[in-house]
Amino acid sequence: MNRKNDETIEKILPKNQTLDADREERPTVISPVPALINTFIALITSVLLAFVLLPRIPILEKGELATRTITAPYALSIESPGPDKTMIFFKVDKGEEIIEAGHRVTERAARILAEIGRHEGIGNRFQAYVGLAALVLMIFYLFYRDIRRYRPALLGDTRKILLLALLLFLTISVSQVAKQFISLIADKLQLDIMTIGFALPLASGAMLVCLLLDFHLALGFSFVVSVLLGISFQGDPFIPVYYFMGSIVAALSVIQCKKRTAVLKAGALTMLVNLLVIGCIDFYQGELLMRGLYDMAAGFLGAVGVTMIVSVTLPFFEAVFDIATDIKLLELLDPNQPLLKELVYKSPGTYHHSILIGNLAEAAAETIGENPILARVGAYYHDIGKIHKPGYFIENQRTVENKHDRLMPSLSSLIIASHVKEGVDLAREHKLPSAVIDIIQQHHGTSLISFFYQKAKELQPFVAIAEEDYRYPGPRPRTKVAAIVMLADSVEAASRTLYNPPTQRIQALTNSVINRIVLDDQLSMCDLTLKDLQDISGSFNLILSGIFHQRIDYPGIEYPGEHKRSDYQVKKHTEEKKVGAGRNKGETLNPVDETRAS
């Protein structure tokens, strides 16, 4: 798009418009209610995690293998029978080593552990519990600052914050349970706690966060989990490194995940990295071959566990938290989806119109850094409500006869507007993600169904016609992607009036449609900036220029109806000048077409 057309969008906006280029530089303001809820979620999660992570002294019997070094949590005196059956008292100092990892429990150690078990409880360890909870909360605060800086929109979405907290709690809790279960096997094989740590499938949490939210959050999630598990394994420096590297690779491997089977490949890559990291750790520590083989086997099991957990739980989290992952969205693009099949059979014109809008919306979304897959899916499904009354929309009419000619403008307006509500109902019936339903509901905003409004004024020139009665019910677009679909819809519909247009005319048409939508205050609820609008306009022009490229007439070939169609178009343009109305999605720039339009 040339500089002249770039400036057109800026000049037409009033200076008091909220849509301005400085919006991106404004500090993020979080509503008090979500902020309080987020704080409450963080406090509850930190308290629960502190309870889960609080070290518990295992009660081991004489001869059992200690999987970790155990020290006395506090000083105590113990009475024990001596060799001659006389009672002997001995003291244990706080922090004194009771049993070393990898050693068998002695009779003395067993008595100390039994005595500690009798006094164990939150009441006796309140200080440690409070300190651990405060530490967890501090780690959460660092994560919060990162989210506020790089993903501020997430803080206003309590549903996703709750999902993040739940995944964090489940990852740590499952690891603690799995650690106890694996310890039973390790006792038989005489393995130490590090080998147990290698077998825990903790990378599944980061992979789920990346799939359900995004990679940046998965990066912070991996850091938090690694630090907390470092506490759980009593400061072993290699365990956090192992978890962090495995989690990052697991998240990286699903950034471009397009199929559910891709999780298997991600699990295989995670396994290779696990084995590589384990090999480096064992080589550094000078471990023997047999110990190294056990560690490698543990790393392999951990990667297998990651794949199984993600494959089983991903559909569950998608459904419960209504998250539209790229995998789910790509499945919705399958032409064999029931709604798309019904659309192509009942409303073929609408279907092909939606495909073109999908091309425009995807390109525009990619240009401004939004989700292009969501934009295409939203475009494919935005007009599914036309399935019920396809003949009332211009793209599905194959004759000059217009059903609206026999209807009052008010009734025609209701029929045109009803496809939004009917589309939302169909989407909910087929359990489409809420992100797609929002696009369906918002793709017209509260725009005016201008042709029927003008027609009503002509039929009743002495009656005050309420403009609100001829507007779509809304709401206006709340997200950039919904706004992109609205713009693409209007631009694509308006472009149908063009015939072999030069590039400059396409640019002028695109800017005219976008400016009209902006001036109608349809974009004031989303975060589009002037720079975004310029980029969107440029991407539209590029796509439309490819569609309306110059064509030549082949000698000896006649095109039946060509001239008749051209005359018909000329007639429509003449009538349009009389009405002076433009298309506002649901209506074309051509007033005669508007009576039959979407």
Language-model-detected regions and their locations in the chain:
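Short, well-ordered coil loops that connect the C-terminus of an alpha-helix to the N-terminus
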Residues: 215, 323, 370, 433-434
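Generic detector of multi-pass transmembrane helix bundles and their immediately adjacent loops
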Residues: 166, 170-173, 177, 184-195, ...
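Juxtamembrane "helix exit" motif at the C-terminal ends of alpha-helical transmembrane segments
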Residues: 50-57, 139-151, 172-181, 275-286
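Short hydrophobic/aromatic-rich motifs at helix boundaries and adjacent loops
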Residues: 178-179, 221-222, 285-289, 332-334, ...
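Membrane-embedded alpha-helical signal segments
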Residues: 1-163, 209, 345-367, 373-430, ...
